[in-house]
Design a protein with these regions (language model features):
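Active-site cofactor/substrate anionic-group-binding motifs, chiefly glycine-
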Residues: 3-32, 42
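Short beta-strand segments
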Residues: 19-22, 74-78, 139-145, 154, ...
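Active-site catalytic microenvironments in core metabolic enzymes, especially phosphate/sugar-handling
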Residues: 21-25, 227-229, 257-303
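Proline/glycine-rich low-complexity loops and linkers
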Residues: 42-51, 104-132, 298-326
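Internal gly/pro-rich beta-alpha loop/helix module
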Residues: 89-176
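Internal helix-turn-beta structural module
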Residues: 276-361
Length: 361
């Protein structure tokens, strides 16, 4: 919604009407001034809901109501895969919700998750382009995916994609569900001739901003180019070994980790879990470690992540907290709250994945 507000206030952009769909409680302050021009809808993330289907129907209705010579401006960012949906026939909302929860809880990466979403959708994977009927369209995108691929961002509703799902990437129950539904094909490449897509913000921008600020604070800064992904347990081992051998200063990474959740997880998200695992690794060391989502949310919580140091576990022990139980139960958020190591920023309005920062003194 922050993108919408910027477009509405830009002197060179003239918007006759618009539709804004964002996460609940994430509407940008200031949009209320434009209620005569735009309609604002709030939807659900990370698991789609009935509201997501209603927003999908509203989006298609909005496009279909426009004139043949009207031009479109789409502002896409992370979360669109869940916020807006129009599922294929023969696939129910309950099935979609259960499948999404299974994919998220088992640690699949965003590419594999969005490939599934495209399979069961009538708008993802370039299919929304069919509703535009070759009208001139500009797509401005904030990337929240590895390597900034427009086909993956918000599941690529306006990017041509005829790739097939690699069934070898999934467990049997998910593979069986994929085989049971015949997907709708992506429109012909000719339907994309009037669509111009540009990425206007990405993870590298946030990493370079951290580097610049660190230098202003007189830190020696080290910008790590490798993209951080994979299970948080493996990543904690990687960061621990790295920090054991690296130079003193500010070390910067970016990416998006994953967590395999127990049947009944507690409070937290991937960043909070990684931070708690690192609290154990850096115990009694002169290191500060932060992992946080740039959008201000981490998993199904209102917190961004966690920031820990060499004394975090000792604080927990003083409060008689067994950090191993909190890790096992994926309840890192409650541990961080009790040890004052929770990062809570509120919605930032921008999502370019996660930042991981470490200061070695």
């Amino acid at each position: 919604s922050s993108m919408a507000l910027a477009a509405l206030e830009h002197p060179n952009i003239k918007i006759k009407s618009g539709l804004v769909i964002t996460k609940r409680n994430h509407l940008e302050v200031g949009l209320e001034k434009y209620t005569k021009t735009i309609k604002c809808l709030e939807s659900d993330h990370p698991t789609p809901s009935l509201t997501s289907l209603e927003c999908g129907a509203d989006l298609i209705k909005f496009i279909n109501s426009k004139q043949p010579d009207d031009e479109f401006l789409f502002l896409l960012s992370g979360g669109g895969s869940s916020l807006v949906e129009n599922i294929v026939e023969g696939f129910s909302l309950e099935e979609l919700m259960n499948l999404t929860d299974a994919l998220l809880s088992r640690g699949y990466n965003i590419n594999d998750i969005n490939a599934i979403r495209k399979h069961f959708s009538q708008i993802k994977g370039g299919k929304l382009a069919g509703f535009l009927k070759n009208r001139k369209t500009t797509v401005l995108t904030i990337s929240d995916v590895p390597f900034d691929d427009p086909k993956v961002i918000a599941s690529g509703p306006l990017s041509h994609d005829d790739a097939k799902i690699n069934l070898d990437n999934y467990e049997d129950d998910i593979t069986d569900k994929i085989k049971s539904i015949r997907p709708i094909s992506c429109p012909d490449i000719s339907m994309f001739s009037n669509i111009n897509t540009k990425i206007i913000a990405k993870l590298d921008d946030a990493k370079f901003a951290c580097k610049s600020h660190g230098e202003k604070l007189n830190y020696e800064t080290y910008l790590n180019e490798n993209f951080i992904e994979g299970d948080v347990n493996s990543l904690a081992n990687y960061f621990s070994e790295y920090l054991e051998n690296c130079q003193k200063g500010l070390h910067i990474w970016g990416g998006e980790s994953s967590v395999n959740l127990p049947e009944k997880p507690g409070r937290g998200g991937r960043n909070q879990q990684l931070a708690l695992l690192m609290a154990e690794k850096i115990r009694n060391k002169d290191i500060v470690f932060l992992s946080a989502g740039t959008d201000g949310t981490d998993g199904p919580t209102n917190d961004a992540g966690g920031i820990v140091d060499g004394n975090t576990i000792n604080k927990g022990n003083e409060c008689k907290l067994d950090y191993k139980k909190f890790i096992k139960n994926a309840d890192s958020g409650n541990y961080h709250e009790k040890t004052n190591s929770l990062v809570t920023t509120g919605p930032t309005g921008t999502n370019v994945m996660d930042l991981i920062l470490a200061i070695k003194k």
